[in-house]
Amino acid sequence: MKKDFPKIGPTVTMFVPYDCNNACPFCVNKKEYRDTSSFDLNRCFQALDLMDRIFPHNDVVLTGGEPLAELGALQNILDHIADGHHIYINTTMPVGEGQTIQDVADILNKYADRISCINVSRDLKHYVKECPDEIFKLFKFRTRINCVVFEDAKDSETREKLIKFLDRFQGHEIQLRANYSYLTLENVFDTENDNLFKLISEICEYKYPLEKERFRTGYVFERNGSKITYHKTLPFAKVDGVVGDIIIRQTGRIYDDWNEYGHELNINDLVTHQYK
């Protein structure tokens, strides 16, 4: 399937209706997975179908939880998503008991024509068991290393950790993300007082800014052959009444924003704004 169609409409992010085995201290979704009794994959499918009728060419993001925690269910989800969407998967890239990195790669590569990118979480500090980096050589689709920088950017130790991290993934596409819990409408687009932006600028070559959206922005850098994007996004996506991200929760219920910021989606909110 071709992937060169334009994105039209807000991103639909689906929280997979099954848990992960991680316990990352910064995870804001873990509490929602403590009780899975109301989770329903079929209702999630119905929600995906409804959103596809409204926005047949938007981005669909699978997150969690851990999408790769149940590879069978993940394949069912990928099979269900209609053609015409860019599909992204957020994962820590676990390799289950009795599996190899080749097993995982073989399953995901079956969807190489459907997957636009897999964002693989790696951090300056190890929070989860990481599979060997060699897995990235096995994939037949785009991957991106995703790192939320929680450490103090003014600390010299953070600088050393970041350089070591960038060297580890030299040649890969990398996305460094600001700690969204500190971002507001007043500072999300600010770089003058952004210590992490300054640190990245010191150790990488600045290239250009990404186009600003209502609730997020980004800046592109380069270092030793790696494209490095510094991404800043608010912890909420609905600004001035305009829905930026649509959330399908594990129950199949559809919300207009993230976590405690979100309310059940009012379809009428989607027709009052001209999405591009």
Question: Would you name each region that the model predicts?
Answer:
Residues 51, 77-81, 134-140:
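Hydrophobic positions in alpha-helices of CheY-like receiver
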Residues 11, 29-42, 54-70, 84-100, ...:
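Core AdoMet radical
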Residues 31, 242-243:
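Regulatory, intrinsically disordered low-complexity regions in eukaryotic nuclear proteins
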Residues 1-44:
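Canonical Radical SAM [4Fe-4S] cluster-binding loop centered on the CxxxCxxC motif
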Residues 272-276:
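Cysteine/selenocysteine-centered motifs that mediate thiol-based redox chemistry or coordinate metal-sulfur cofactors
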Residues 36, 123-242, 250, 255, ...:
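Radical SAM enzyme [4Fe-4S]-AdoMet core and its adjacent flexible, acidic
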Residues 72-77, 97-110, 129-134, 155-164:
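Distinct, well-ordered alpha-helical segments
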